[in-house]
Amino acid sequence: MTSNSPIGLEGSDLSSINTMMSAVMSVASVTENGGSPQGIKSPMKPPGPNRIGRRNQETKEEKSSYNCPLCEKICTTQHQLTMHIRQHNTDTGGADHACSICGKSLSSASSLDRHMLVHSGERPYKCTVCGQSFTTNGNMHRHMKIHEKDTNSTTAAAPPSPLKRRRLSSKRKLSHDAESEDPGPAKKMVEDGQSGDLDKMSDEIFHCPVCFKEFVCKYELETHMETHSDNPLRCDICCVTFRTHRGLLRHNALVHKQLPRDAMGRPFIQNNPSIPAGFHDLGFTDFSCRKFPRISQAWCETNLRRCISEQHRFVCDTCDKAFPMLSSLILHRQSHIPADQGREKLQTKTLAAESLEQKAFLALLGLQHTKDVKPAPAEELLPDDNQAIQLQTLKYQLPQEPGCPTVLSVSPLDAASLGGSLTVLPATKENMKHLSLQPFQKGFIIQPDSSIVVKPISGESAIELADIQQILKMAASAPPQISLPPLSKAPATPLQAIFKHMPPLKPKPLVTPRTVVAASTPPPLINAQQASPGCISPSLPPQSLKFLKGSVEAVSNVHLLQSKSGIQPSTTTQLFLQQAGVELPGQPEMKTQLEQESIIEALLPLNMEAKIKQEITEGDLKAIMTGPSGKKTPAMRKVLYPCRFCNQVFAFSGVLRAHVRSHLGISPYQCNICDYIAADKAALIRHIRTHSGERPYICKICHYPFTVKANCERHLRKKHLKATRKDIEKNIEYVSSPTAELVDAFCAPETVCRLCGEDLKHYRALRIHMRTHCSRGLGGCHKGRKPFECKECNAPFVAKRNCIHHILKQHLHVPEKDIESYVLATNSGLGPADTPTDAASRGEEGSCVTFAECKPLATFLEPQNGFLHSSPTQPLPSHISVKLEPASSFAMDFNEPLDFSQKGLALVQVKQENVSSLLTSSSSSALYDCSMEPIDLSIPKSVKKGDKDTVVPSDAKKPEPEAGQAEPLSPRPPPCPTLSVTVEPKGSLETPTGTVVAVTTAAKLEPHTQPLQGSVQLAVPIYSPALVSNTPLLGNSAALLNNPALLRPLRPKPPLLLPKPSMTEELPPLASIAQIISSVSSAPTLLKTKVADPGPSITSSNTVATDSPGSSIPKAAATPTDTTSSKESSEPPPAASSPEEALPTEQGPAATSSSRKRGRKRGLRNRPLPNSSAVDLDSSGEFASIEKMLATTDTNKFSPFLQTAEDDTQEEVAGAPADQHGPADEEQGSPAEDRLLRAKRNSYANCLQKINCPHCPRVFPWASSLQRHMLTHTDSQSDTDTLTTPGEVLDLTAQAKEQPPAEGASEISPASQDLAIKEAKAAAAPSEEEEEKETEENPEPEEECRVEESTGAADAPEEDTASNQSLDLDFATKLMDFKLAESEAGSVDSQGPAQQEPKHACDTCGKNFKFLGTLSRHKKAHSCQEPKEEEAAAPSLENEGVGRAVEGPSPSPEPEEKPAESLAIDPTPGTREASVAKQNEETEGPTDGEGTAEKRGDGDKRPKTDSPKSMASKADKRKKVCSVCNKRFWSLQDLTRHMRSHTGERPYKCQTCERTFTLKHSLVRHQRIHQKARHSKHHGKDSDKDERAEEDSEDESTHSATNPASENEAESAPSTSNHVAVTRSRKESLSTSGKECSPEERAAAEQAAEPSAPKEQASPGETDPQSPAAIVQDLLELCGKRPAPILAATDGASQLLGME
């Protein structure tokens, strides 16, 4: 967009008629020539440098009305004119990409995407050098050229003077004249007071005024300055804040006589970029006047300036100040001499003349030597009123005790000096605190009449802290009992107003730690390092300082403490000096203090009575020092609590405590996706919207959505000219959304129970509630663990208050004030919850446990700076893995590929949230012996078969019993506990130990569990150990995700956006972006478990129960039919507590297919997500993508984006049958979207530099474009890729790259193992075909289709059913020929004990073999054939799935499992194509072009996925149309072959077995089998049978390949949809009844079915009720249709998968 297109100029207003008109005219000329409004985009040279002024002038002239230059229409506002003019541009077809907000027509969808950023204010592209952000990558790269120039001549252009500075639009083309202005980062310009310095050297270095870092480039400096945004421009002495560095420097120089200094402590003025250059500001006076030297001297001493000229440099050597003339400099130098000498003399005199004791004595009497009081003019006289006093108080970072009369007006050091002789608390006491004092740079002399004189200390030496004279002056001038109005009565509001903005982080500069003092003599610095601003030691956070009360009590307190500690008063001073080191507690203790209440300084009430003060005991002191937690006197509520790190003042200590957390980096409100730490929940909610793309505030006028209300208001003001608050509010619509709940899910650690998700509202209630979990033994805690104990009788209590109550009642001798010390917080020794490591750490850190230090774990587990720390007296809880990289991040089996998708998500990190990568194969536990190491919970734990059924209870509160199930198991940990649990969404693990450890122990308690079959990457909050310890093991993300309690997802930390291949597998870039974003968005269930089953899997439906979403059926609940393993119960989960959970089973395929469409939120949630490998592509719709954004804008322009959401609801409403047609309809009905997608694809087509998207054919000129585009791809790719490699463990001959068996599957027997492998292949095929079909269904997410091919296929029950269908029909034909009675046995018994029988059954066709070798050869035959079957099955998948759904939920679990197995069949488009190609090779042979047709069909498929063009657009090019089903074909030959599927004609006949084939090459292949069969009779038979199945599926697959959209058939006969469902259910019943019929009946029925088999396969959608297949099915139903088995026997069903 040109800089002079009005909309293009984001930063400038829309008022430039002239500019706009030129753009319009150019557009008009372009459009006349047939071009699209590209003219708007072609950058025109911007007008001259004064164009802004000129434009404004013209605007003023023409403001009254706006005439369209093309049609003379008069518009009232410029915005209307712009909108109107754009309507002139729509005739070229650009209207397809018109902006719904401003009407601008754009050439392509991607241009529109970019343009929408203008309205949204998003700036996705950031300059790597200076961080300035841009809406388009082109602008960013244009901007980057400036840096290239900058490196050579950094500032050839003068920065603007402060008067000229303005916010520049980030859209500015920073070229030509624009460079003459300062292109500071838009939105981020830091006004750091640089004024124009035209003569800077080209190689000048820019210094950060805060930390003195050097930068070559001004942009770097400006960006860097943002890192100091949390270090507000505040005076360290008087806490006044400034907008600019210049203001602060000026203030410091003027008021505090303080100059900026560099890191070495030298004056830093002449090279300081923050200081303006030149003396032009002195122009207010005539330089020729006689007093000019004096004026300029005075002015330059307070207004720091830099010399510009090398010839005329008049700089003071002492203070580095510059002056405009020599005489000014000479005058200035004189000012240095007396000041320095005077101070030196004064210091030596004072130190020599009097001893410290004498001064202390005088101070006690309120006296001081007259020579100590320097007559300094009072610069400001504060009135003696509340507000002044409050202000004065707030000038100190450290809170003082309000009871001290002088403390309000005296700096901490002075207060320290007010007391009696030196008070030192006994060094052994735990309440030795550090005192971080700030530089004593300004004193207040309190005069006897209570007036306060502010006495500035002049000169640089003011920075020194231990200025004893000043301290003593302050002390001496304070009358002993001065009375000041109590702060509690002061109004709080003025203060709140004064300290308006809370800058985020960083304590104020430094304050050297001092010991706590209540003495008159100033304590020496503990740390020799003199505090110059910025040298704070990170390890010494300022501690709260509480003072003893007045000077008189101080003395008594001193004596009291001295007598207790046995110190004589005379030795106090030496003691103080000697003990400086002793009193420095170790860092751990400091950390503890930080984490305890002393984090928050609380001002104690002013009106404490003297008698209380005189009776100060150690307990009281301790309470005062640590900040009383619970028992505050009522007055305390009225005290104000200022923040030590910033200006804010709080009325409640709790609020302050929460606020301080944000400074310390331990805020519970941390973003899980990035490193953002919010000060409060609201800020976090706002921040999360940037990730989720959620925009709850909608402009009612143009329906544009905004993330933040302020933006919406600004939009209304600027775009719709709404001026009044009422108008603005009236036009903002708020759409409530789940973000707040999401935030609650992971950032309300203080109230939400991690185990059951209950929101307890109060943290204390939560802590007590957590004990109920512990007492159940969920986490392996002691069953009745009670954290509080009575010191007298050791009685344990659940709550502290109970213990106090007990002490009050039972131990009457305990004085009330000491009760607190009689409550012991027991953090028991090495309980089951503690690992050896913890014990060790506990030992190291010391064992003195006082109640103050044994606060509930949560207090200490708040992460600081990204890592969790624990109190010194507390071990790291066992759930915090000591290692930063858990072993579980990598597969335990060293033959498997490393999985780096979990890298960096170690439990120690704050933001990891993946429920671990459970990457263990059966061998992994054996491989990794962790008996000698601390138990690392990050290693995935093996699953016990029995536990698989304890599926996540759908109810939030059900987990406990199930986790409890683990209890009875042997407590010894398995050789390798491999369940890694990320216990808390934030890693801040704020729940007490037991809670979190629950998961751990649950994991530990299952020694003989079976190793997990695959890696599960659940992005699910861990609410319950049951959820964690069982569900992830099951790989049942669906269950988790559908669980209402769990719909608040965790967000794993996103990996880098650009592709970065990991070690062994190519991990596509966004391993978890989809998870992140979809989880943030309203469809959290888009995340699917990552299933990679390296090991062998078991029989078909073993994951059935586990995978069914809500299923919480315990083992026992499995239906009787499943005698073998209750795991395999196919019964629908009874416990699905919400319709959504139940949906996946009942709606089955319907839900799934619908959920595949983009924007499908509910569908997605319903989806079982069986073990699907990846995130559904739909989740891309949930990203903060432009498309989603546009979808929210209510305009038909983007109906393609909105369409899916509508379809979604329609489909879900319509139920199963409708679903099959939905996709096809969508397919046909979205040509507009095709155009969008086509345009999207072409938007960068002709760019020179081409970066290919790894997931789709799109090409991008910049990495940033690719990054943005990558957001449209989900996680699936990475998952599937990840799966690919483990898949290699299996020998899936024909599909080398394809998939490992299902994750949830646990192995039952070698036979069943083989079955599983076989089935995996069987399912793989359908999934593949299904994927292709999906692509047809969803033209919109074309790019994503690829990804979805693998996932979607696996997700849906339909795939299975499809494979069932195709295999059923094949089986019928095979059965007819071979009359295999055993097959019946195989199929019927496959679900029963037959699995364990020595016979080896083929899971695809049910055939039994005596020898395993025979079976494996037989399977190889299937592996060749099944890809075809898969393809064939696909067309029917959806219909069949629906049918099954109609019939009953039974199939749904089975499909869930099957696809899981077939999950990774097509991990990547490449693989998929490879497998298709392979099929083609196998199937093609020397045929009459059938192969070609098939290949061509594949071609169709491939382009369909590869190019964003949808199938519909391609269909037009195919000229041959089937008269029956209206499908189109490339050639007559293809059509002829296709017609055979309608006619049932099978012209090719095998001479040996008289079997007939639709395709010639099928016959040829079949005959090869006979040749092999001569060598091995059994094998021949098998392969023949396989071959037949393959041939059937081939003709079907040809059909489907050539016309992928088999739904079209269904569409053509809408009325058949219901019927289809019925026939499918017939097939279902056929499958089950098939099992129950006698072999003869079955054979007969299947013979009858055989002719129709190909027909059914070819076009399941159009199955005629009277078709032979239907008749056959009816026959079979007559044989024995028993619904219960259908429901319960998925095992058998899944084995029939290949047979029916």
From Swiss-Prot:
GO biological process, one term: positive regulation of brown fat cell differentiation
Bias-annotated ranges (Basic and acidic residues): 184-195, 944-961, 1492-1507
Gene Ontology terms: cellular component: fibrillar center; nuclear speck
Biased composition (Acidic residues): 1327-1346
UniProt keywords, alphabetically: Activator, DNA-binding, Isopeptide bond, Metal-binding, Nucleus, Phosphoprotein, Repeat, Repressor, Transcription, Transcription regulation, Ubl conjugation, Zinc, Zinc-finger
Stretches with biased composition (Polar residues): 1097-1111
GO molecular function: DNA-binding transcription activator activity, RNA polymerase II-specific; DNA-binding transcription factor activity; RNA polymerase II cis-regulatory region sequence-specific DNA binding; zinc ion binding
Expressed in which tissues: Expressed in splenic B-cells.
UniProt entry tagged with the keyword Methyltransferase: no
Subcellular location: Nucleus speckle
Cross-link Glycyl lysine isopeptide (Lys-Gly) (interchain with G-Cter in SUMO2) per UniProt, renumbered positions: 433, 500, 549, 564, 591, 611, 613, 622, 855, 883, 911
Region of interest (Disordered), ranges: 31-63, 146-195, 939-991, 1092-1177, 1195-1235, 1273-1368, 1383-1521, 1564-1670
Sequence ranges of Basic residues compositional bias: 163-174, 1155-1165, 1564-1580
Main location: nucleus
Renumbered zinc finger spans (C2H2-type): 66-88, 97-119, 125-147, 206-228, 233-256, 314-336, 641-663, 669-691, 697-720, 751-782, 788-813, 1251-1273, 1400-1422, 1520-1542, 1548-1570
PROSITE patterns: ZINC_FINGER_C2H2_1, ZINC_FINGER_C2H2_2
Modified residues (Phosphoserine): 36, 42, 161, 175, 180, 229, 970, 1125, 1137-1138, 1172, 1179-1180, 1230, 1450, 1452, 1593, 1606, 1667
InterPro entries tied to this protein: RREB1 (IPR052795), Znf_C2H2_sf (IPR036236), Znf_C2H2_type (IPR013087)
Record family assignment: Belongs to the krueppel C2H2-type zinc-finger protein family.
PANTHER family cross-referenced by the UniProt entry: RAS-RESPONSIVE ELEMENT-BINDING PROTEIN 1
Subunit and interaction comment: Interacts with NEUROD1. Interacts with AR.
Identification of the protein by name: Ras-responsive element-binding protein 1
Organism expressing this protein natively: Mus musculus (Mouse)
Encoding gene, per UniProt annotation: Rreb1
